[in-house]
């Protein structure tokens, strides 16, 4: 599986996920600088106030 892994509004980059990982994620939250976005492999659990979207196809988390 190939997932996007750039932070917030940086130029898109991708990474190959290891260990048979089948999910990509896009996590979004707000801090004093505005909205922040994190992308990567997996589907981590998140705290309240953090929005997360998980998906299962190549580059689906941009």
Swiss-Prot record:
Origin, by domain of life? Answer: Eukaryota
| CDD domains in UniProt | TFP_snake_toxin
Which segments cross the bilayer?
none
- InterPro entries for the chain: Snake_3FTx, Snake_toxin-like_sf, Snake_toxin_con_site, Toxin_cobra-type
- Renumbered to this chain, region (Disordered) spans 1-22
List locations, semicolon-separated. Answer: Secreted
Task: Tell me where it mainly resides.
Answer: secreted
Q: Where is the composition biased (Polar residues)?
A: 1-16
Q: What GO cellular component is one of the record's annotations?
A: extracellular region
User: Coiled-coil intervals in this record?
Assistant: none
Distribution of this protein across tissues and organs: Expressed by the venom gland.
GO MF annotations for this entry?
Answer: acetylcholine receptor inhibitor activity; ion channel regulator activity; toxin activity
Give disulfide pairs as residue numbers. Answer: 3-24, 17-41, 43-54, 55-60
UniProt keyword list: Acetylcholine receptor inhibiting toxin, Disulfide bond, Ion channel impairing toxin, Neurotoxin, Postsynaptic neurotoxin, Secreted, Toxin
Give the UniProt family note. Belongs to the three-finger toxin family. Short-chain subfamily. Type I alpha-neurotoxin sub-subfamily.
Q: What does this protein do?
A: Binds to muscle nicotinic acetylcholine receptor (nAChR) and inhibit acetylcholine from binding to the receptor, thereby impairing neuromuscular transmission.
Protein name per the record: Neurotoxin 3
Species for this entry: Naja sputatrix (Malayan spitting cobra)
């Amino acid at each position: 599986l190939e997932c996007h892994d750039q932070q917030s509004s940086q130029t898109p980059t991708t990474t190959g996920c290891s260990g048979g990982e089948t999910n990509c994620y896009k996590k979004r939250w707000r801090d004093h600088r505005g909205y922040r976005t994190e992308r990567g492999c997996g589907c981590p659990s998140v705290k309240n106030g953090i929005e997360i979207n998980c998906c299962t196809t190549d580059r689906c988390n941009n």
